[in-house]
C-alpha cells in the first residue's frame, strides 16, 4: 500500500517500540511505521454465531438467476435472419428518432387539435390522450391495455388516485363531524371553506380540460387501451421511456404474452437509448428469461406469438447485448 500513498515528508527507519515513551515526534512516527508494517492487509473477525440470533452465512454470496429455458431448435431464428433484422431495426430506430426530433412541439399540436375540434366537434380522432404520471404504474397499465371488462371493477379501476384520496379524506371528515361540531364549531366552518376552495379549483381544472379536448381517465366509463402511435411516442422522453420499459417487463413477468404487449415493448425498445442503466439491464435479462419460457411452451411453428417472441428476444439479446456467454449453450 505504500506505493499508492503519497508521502508528506520523509520518516527515518522504523524503530521497535520499548517500554519508554518516544522523546520526539519523529521517533513516535517510526514506532507507528513499525506497527503498520506488521498489520495484516485483511482481518476477519471470529464471530461466535451461537451467542447472536443470526444464521450462519452461506458460502455463496448470492443466488444465481435461472438460466434461459431450452426450446426446440426449429423455433429459433437463423443467424442470417438475425443479422438482417438487426440492420432493419437499427435503421428503424434512426428513422424514429428523426421523426421525433422533427415533429412539432406538443403545444403546437394542442393548438391545431383545438382548432380542428372547434370546426368539427363530433370528430373523436382529434382527442389527445392524457399521459398518466410517470410514477402512476396502475394507470399506465390502463392507458396501454384498457380497464377491466367487469362493470363492478370498472368504477374502482378507472378512478384516479387523487380522487380516491379526496374521497377517503371526505369520509373521515364525515365520521368525525359529530365530535368536531360539539367541540369546536369554528373548525367545521374552516373545513367547509377549504372544501369549497378545493371544489372551485377542481371546477377550473375541469373547464381547462374541456377546452383542451383532453381525454380524462378519471371517468367511470370503461376505457380502451391505446396503441403506441407516433403521437404518443413523440411525447415520451428518455426517463419516461426507461420507466415504461421496466413497467412492461414487470407486467410480462406476471401475465401471459399477447400481441398488444409485444407492440408496446417493441416500440419502447425502439426508443430506448444506449447506454442503459444497470437496473434496466437486469430487467432486460429477466425479460429474455421470461420470453424463453414462453417460447419453450410453443409446439406449433405457425403459432402467431412465435415471431413476436423471437423479435423481442433478438433485440434484447443481440442489439442491447444482454445475452451471457453461458446462455449460448441453452439456445
Curated annotation (Swiss-Prot):
Gene3D superfamilies to which the protein is assigned, alphabetical: 1.20.58.1070
The entry's keywords: Coiled coil, Cytoplasm, mRNA processing, mRNA splicing, Nucleus, Spliceosome
Ranges in a coiled coil: 173-224
Biological processes, Gene Ontology terms: spliceosomal snRNP assembly
Region (Disordered): 1-23, 101-130, 151-222
Compositional bias segments (type: Acidic residues): 11-21, 165-215
Family, per entry: Belongs to the gemin-2 family.
Protein name: Gem-associated protein 2
Organism: Dictyostelium discoideum (Social amoeba)
Gene (UniProt): gemin2
